[in-house]
A protein has these predicted regions:
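A eukaryotic "domain-start" boundary segment
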Residues: 1-21
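Hydrophobic, aromatic-lined core segments that form the binding pocket/scaffold
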Residues: 14-16, 20-200
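Cys/His-clustered metal-coordination modules, chiefly Zn-binding fingers
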Residues: 167-170, 174-240
Length: 240
């Protein structure tokens, strides 16, 4: 989950936009282990990791507490080493969205919305309008990876965050339901939220390709949209 209070040295989105060396350093951490200098692959990985780190604690909070923390760029910072900290996301202020029945609905930091669909869509809108847009614009500008492709990758991470949160907490069906709601936001952060089944468990099939298969000896991911259903089922069965 996200922590409250930003430790010294942690980075917000605007820190990345203000300094190309800082952005490059964080991209290098995000793409550690990727044996390639192809900027389109590295950019895709970076956008995915940044979105995943932000969306995961937010999705878990919506799922478990029916509260959405404010993950706008102005209110959030990330550990410069990303996974180097077990809780790599920090919030500056405790602002949140909640439902009318929440005991803290009257708190000055609370914004009350009608239902959990509104919470899921508020996360989509915050990521789209108040966090990712200038970052994706910047990364697309130097990476030769198209904006639409990067937005698909970001949307996949939003959907995947809800699916994984549901699996991790024993609420798989609810996680899938919220994933579909979150994916129904306005373009460019809009997707199918395709969720197949294998052995009774959800398998999120991405809308966009992460390009991992273009690495030396890189296979298609299990949730790759380029992988046909029979091959996906075979690999899942082999790994069961």
């Amino acid at each position: 989950m996200a922590r409250l209070g930003v430790p010294p040295g942690w980075l917000g989105r605007d820190d990345l936009l203000a300094s190309r060396p800082t952005l490059d350093a964080v991209m290098e951490v995000a793409t550690s282990g990727y044996d390639t200098d192809r900027l389109d692959i590295l950019a895709t990985r970076f956008v995915e990791i940044w979105t995943w780190l932000i969306a995961t604690p937010a999705a878990a909070s919506v799922l478990l507490a029916r509260r959405l923390p404010d993950v706008s760029a102005a209110n959030l910072a990330v550990h410069p080493g990303l996974w180097a900290d077990p809780a790599p996301v920090a919030l500056r202020a405790p602002r949140f969205w909640c439902l009318p029945a929440d005991p803290a609905a009257g708190h000055p930091d609370a914004t009350v919305v009608a239902d959990d669909a509104a919470l899921a869509l508020a996360l989509n809108a915050t990521l789209r309008e108040r966090h990712l847009a200038p970052l994706i614009e910047t990364v697309a500008g130097f990476s030769l990876r198209g904006r639409r492709a990067l937005w698909r990758s970001a949307t996949d991470q939003l959907v995947g965050a809800f699916v994984r949160a549901g699996e991790a907490t024993g609420n798989a069906e609810e996680g899938c339901r919220l994933a579909r709601l979150a994916a129904a936001g306005d373009p460019p952060m809009h997707g199918q939220a395709r969720i197949d089944r294998h052995g009774g468990q959800p398998v999120h099939v991405r809308d966009g390709c992460c390009l991992y298969y273009r690495l030396p000896d890189g296979p298609h991911c299990l949730n790759c949209p380029l992988l046909d259903a029979d091959e996906r089922a075979r690999r899942l069965a082999a790994g069961a």
